[in-house]
Amino acid sequence: MALDRYSYPFTAIVGQDEMKLALVLNAINPTIGGVLIRGEKGTGKSTAVRALARLLPEQMVVEGCHFGCHPDDPEDWCADCRERAENGPLPVTTRRMRVVELPINASEDRVVGTIDLEAALKEGSRRFEPGVLAEANRNILYVDEVNLLDDHIVDVLLDAAAMGVNTVEREGVSVSHPSRFILVGTMNPEEGELRPQLLDRFGLCVDVEGIRDLDQRVAIVEKRAVWEDDPNLFYQQHAESEQAVRSQIAEAIGTFPEVTLPREILRLIAQISIALEVDGHRSDLVCARAAQAKAAYDSDEQVGVSHVSEVAEMVFAHRVHSVPFGKGGPNLGEVISRMVGTQ
């Protein structure tokens, strides 16, 4: 097996269970809307994202397609695949999901792609140079220090993540292509916050910090030393646990659409949102989707109270209004515990 310097096993990561769960849930159901990971550097954020990509199932793609279109999903084909399909069956190959990184200084053109206006005006052709959102289609889009990006760029990313389509318009010329991806943003709150309107559009949010447990800190150093000395041996030592999680994710992706969501669970989610005084209804939708994904991951056929309890904090943490010191207000953990405990 060819290994690169980023392929540290997912199951070898010590601690950070909430972060790992948030990533897995988005892999099972990308409509959750991505995850924002807040915390200091050196806490395994990028390592976990790259390790997750190795666990996800291979994809069928149209060979030669810039956007990695799925051959069996013509409604989501790009213009090139539609045109090629008129001349016969499309060639098919497989690929693994990969992590596409957004450079911190990326321009809007680099993100969305560029249209050759000269060719459009002179020849009537639509020559398009794909951007990061094209590379990200059916992959993981990793945005480090998302809080340092221009707000407009963040808006563009979140729009594409929500719609599954990237549309570029220049001088009356328009090009659209599929752009469905798992969005993972990271930030250090000490370097600046995101506007609440942008925070709300991330499906899940988790806070990570350096591990304080003595034994776990020692284990991190020991594991890293073994990994750096012989990565192939280290990976083989974790091959069984990696395969178990890989199979669990693949099964959950397949069964997720069949997981039922009882009305009483929807009422519980709504009660939590009301008690926390959360604006809008996005939190209810995300919580329902995340709880369904957790149920599928647990091989359960129906969402239960425990599934809501396990995902609620990562759904609501970034959506609860901050309250001035001494003024009181809803406490996230207390509200969730109280609501779940009454069921």
Predicted regions and their residues:
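Alpha-helix N-cap/helix-initiation sites
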Residues: Q16, L214, P262-R263, D279-L285, ...
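Charged, low-complexity terminal tails
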Residues: M1-A2, K327
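Contiguous, well-ordered alpha-helical segments that form the cores/surfaces of helical PPI scaffolds
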Residues: K20-N29, V286-A296
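Conserved ASCE/P-loop NTPase catalytic core
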Residues: A2-D215
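Conserved AAA+ ATPase small/helical "lid" subdomain
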Residues: N232-C287
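C-terminal engagement/docking regions of AAA+ P-loop ATPases
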Residues: G44, L268-R282, A293-Q343
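Non-catalytic, well-ordered alpha-helical scaffold segments
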Residues: L21, D155, P196, D200, ...
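Conserved AAA+ ATPase core "coupling" helix
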Residues: E108-G113, L194-I253
